[in-house]
């Protein structure tokens, strides 16, 4: 799991066509809001808008993680989750 730029969509299309991967599911895309057109045409690909965290359970976990990061920072600890700049 990761943000869109972590996935090379051209390589993904190639791997799916050659059978190296049997399927893929994406809710973020390499080049912003839209996936490569080839991915839209493939039966073994599921694409959704960026809604992977739209459950109450996930949002509670995210809120707790933020709180733990802030508390850890204030106490001089390493954050639970680090933000890396590209």
What do the predicted segments below correspond to?
Residues 1-86:
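Rossmann-like dinucleotide-binding domain for NAD(H)/NADP(H)
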């Amino acid at each position: 799991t990761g943000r869109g730029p972590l996935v090379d969509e051209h390589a993904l299309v190639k791997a799916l066509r050659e059978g190296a991967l049997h399927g893929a599911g994406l809710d973020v895309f390499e080049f912003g809001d839209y996936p490569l057109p080839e991915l839209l045409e493939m039966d073994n690909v599921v694409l959704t808008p960026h809604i992977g965290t739209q459950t109450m359970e996930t949002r509670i976990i995210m809120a707790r993680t933020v709180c733990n990061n802030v508390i850890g920072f204030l106490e001089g600890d390493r954050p639970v989750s680090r933000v890396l700049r590209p």
